[in-house]
Amino acid sequence: MKRSCENDVSVLRYGHRPGRDDRMTTHVGLTARALGADQVIFPDNATQSAETVSDIVSRFGGPFDVERTDGLNATIREWSGTVIHLTMYGERVQDVTEVIRETCLHHQPLLIIIGGEKVPSDVYEWADWNIAVTNQPHSEVAGLAVFLDRLFMGQELEQEWAGAEHVVVPQACGKRVVDAELTTEADEMNAEK
């Protein structure tokens, strides 16, 4: 799956408590990028998370946009597309994802809201869909990962990353990271054989 950064799928992190949420907010952005979203929108006070995710994009490729806003509510209310709120109180993901994929994905921009603190009741009303992964308390990052994988039907796992400085080489054992230029040269040499 080639990446085309059209911002069809955006993830909005609703709320951020500096110090307490830094790691989780960063993981929301990294998960959004790795599993097929085109952009993440962080609260304005999530500076460290935005910088970390932007650094990963520059080192491991994109396209992927990282934005910050002090107008989370306005972003949701003014969204010109479908708004999806991931919450343990919503409809079961397995019951609604196919409908969302068929009627919304590639037809209009999607905004996926992930809570970082107590989400106001207005967000439930502004959302076109309130969706739950298991209707049980667990990590918002896990919920995002499951939802994106179901939305893209696993195709996001085949992404190619443009502009990467480094490439992770899959291996059964150990770790191997190479310069992207070396990977491209090796691929070209293998193609010529």
Curated annotation (Swiss-Prot):
Keyword Signal: no
GO molecular-function terms, A-Z: tRNA (cytidine(56)-2'-O)-methyltransferase activity
Pfam family, one: Trm56
Xref: InterPro entries: Alpha/beta_knot_MTases, tRNA_m1G_MTases_N, tRNA_mtfrase_aTrm56
Catalytic reactions on record: cytidine(56) in tRNA + S-adenosyl-L-methionine = 2'-O-methylcytidine(56) in tRNA + S-adenosyl-L-homocysteine + H(+)
Coiled coil location: none
GO BP terms: tRNA nucleoside ribose methylation
GO cellular component: cytoplasm
EC number: 2.1.1.206
Subcellular location: Cytoplasm
Classification via SUPFAM superfamilies: alpha/beta knot
List of residues binding S-adenosyl-L-methionine: 86, 115-119
Top EC group: transferase
Keyword line: Cytoplasm, Methyltransferase, S-adenosyl-L-methionine, Transferase, tRNA processing
Similarity field: Belongs to the aTrm56 family.
Assembly mode: Homodimer.
Role summary: Specifically catalyzes the AdoMet-dependent 2'-O-ribose methylation of cytidine at position 56 in tRNAs.
Record-given protein name: tRNA (cytidine(56)-2'-O)-methyltransferase
Organism ancestry: Archaea, Methanobacteriati, Methanobacteriota, Stenosarchaea group, Halobacteria
